[in-house]
Amino acid sequence: MSIEKQVAEQLLEIKAVFLKPNEPFTWASGIKSPIYCDNRLTLGFPKVRQFIAKSLAEKIKQTFGEIDVVAGTATAGIPHAAWVSDLLDLPMVYVRSKAKEHGKGNQIEGPISKGQKVVVIEDLISTGGSSLKAVEALEEAGAEVVGIAAIFTYGLAKGKQLLEESGTKLVTLTNYDELIEVALNENYVTGEDMETLKEWKKNPEKWGK
């Protein structure tokens, strides 16, 4: 079984992903969605989080080669970045969404030097906006961000466009299309639900309105 399918299966099993085609969730952005993904739940399942960390570490080595620093996005990316940096035996930093308003006023916590090659670790990619803020902060600090590694992506057109425009490479362990296929095969959803789930992906902003 592929990594994509294994991770999708695990996320469904521990209920980190909820699929409710008939009772949609409302995201903070206002988008109505038949799916809600909360990868923070992986923290409570040692075997799942270990598999995720190992898979991210392998994917980073295969895709980006030698890097100098692993950066986690605050807050959900931090634990995964810590485990991955341990496996790769590399320094780690984390990046806030904005600079602190007290103390040193840091946006990046941990040492970063000019020219260091960095991979940003994120738990989830929707539009990619928060990840790109982290990339921007690291580049302003002089780092060379070689890409983003995430557990899951919705694969939304808006997110793909933003990442392409910024020239940032994204690798993920699994994605929306793989996940809904696994959900159908494992009887989490019906064939009718699948049609709804596919429709949402085509136009999330207008779906359910």
UniProtKB/Swiss-Prot annotation:
Chain sites annotated for binding orotate: 126
GO molecular function: magnesium ion binding; orotate phosphoribosyltransferase activity
Gene3D superfamilies in UniProt: 3.40.50.2020
Needed co-factor(s): Mg(2+)
Residues holding 5-phospho-alpha-D-ribose 1-diphosphate: 96, 100, 102, 122-130
Pathway: Pyrimidine metabolism; UMP biosynthesis via de novo pathway; UMP from orotate: step 1/2
Keyword Hydrolase: no
InterPro entries: OPRT, Or_phspho_trans_dom, PRibTrfase_dom, PRTase-like
Role played: Catalyzes the transfer of a ribosyl phosphate group from 5-phosphoribose 1-diphosphate to orotate, leading to the formation of orotidine monophosphate (OMP).
NCBIfam families assigned to the protein according to its UniProt record, in alphabetical order: pyrE (TIGR00336)
Subunit structure: Homodimer.
Protein name in the entry: Orotate phosphoribosyltransferase
UniProt source species: Listeria monocytogenes serovar 1/2a (strain ATCC BAA-679 / EGD-e)
Gene responsible for this protein: pyrE
